């Protein structure tokens, strides 16, 4: 069963979000096989995060609720609310069909947003040191 999960950030939670990046990535690593798509939502400036979208293929609604509400950012109060809905992948594609859009390096989820904010992050594009 496919689910759309939209976590919306609380105002002023960017610092806490940054602090929890490694925990968030580790949590998402556990769902790599189930992940259809993921990424941050952004403010009009195209840089400031306002939330996160995850589309996952999970066995049932209980597993989807666990995914959404056990997420470290949700547990720590980064998110103000969660929208969880059934979803249908009518195109039949996933982010894994476009590897340049979803880099995964040595078991750690990375994003351009994270690399820009954490210069000492272990995130590096594939093939670089």
Where are these regions (language model features)?
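Conserved, structured core segments of small domains
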Residues: 1-129
């Amino acid at each position: 069963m496919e689910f759309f999960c939209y976590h919306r950030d609380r105002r002023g939670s960017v610092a806490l979000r940054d602090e929890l990046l490694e925990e968030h990535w580790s949590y998402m690593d556990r769902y790599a096989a189930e992940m259809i798509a993921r990424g941050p939502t952004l403010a009009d400036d195209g840089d400031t995060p306002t939330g996160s979208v995850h589309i996952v293929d999970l066995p049932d609604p209980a597993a989807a609720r666990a995914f959404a509400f056990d997420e470290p950012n949700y547990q720590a109060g980064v998110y103000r609310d969660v929208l969880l809905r059934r979803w249908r992948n009518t195109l039949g594609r996933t982010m894994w069909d476009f590897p340049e859009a979803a880099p995964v390096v040595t078991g750690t989820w990375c994003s351009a947003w994270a690399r820009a904010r954490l210069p000492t992050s272990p995130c590096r594009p594939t093939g670089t040191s």
